[in-house]
Amino acid sequence: MKQLIVGVGLLLAGSPAFASHLAAGPLASGKINGGPAQNHIACYIFNNGTKAVKLSAKSIAGNDGSNVLNDDRCGSKLNSGVGCVLFASSVSASQPYDCAVTASPSTDVRGSIESRSAAGAVLANQALR
């Protein structure tokens, strides 16, 4: 029985669907805080690969975990060589926020989160990992 399970596992591991599942993953930042001048949060996503990727589970969250994302300019698919942005415009000053998105496949997807002032100045930033 053990040999059958191992055999099926190896068979699945070689399948494109399984490989795609393994390559899917969340990209997330740690919390950033722009201080008292913080007005909005921008989360940038860029597909540096040669094929389109699927995007899901997008969020910009505060300390309480609630998703404050209110402007999704990414959609569900990001073509190769293209970037997009997620915004949260109703954020509290001095509260930390993070950004997360699941990309499939995620190997060539990069991103960053920025805390900005009302004038658009970057107050804090961090890469998504």
Locate each region found by the language model.
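Positively charged n-region of N-terminal signal peptides that target proteins for export
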Residues: M1-L4
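Hydrophobic h-region of N-terminal signal peptides that target proteins for export
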Residues: L10-F18
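Gly/Pro-rich, tryptophan- and cysteine-flecked surface segments typical
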Residues: F18-R129
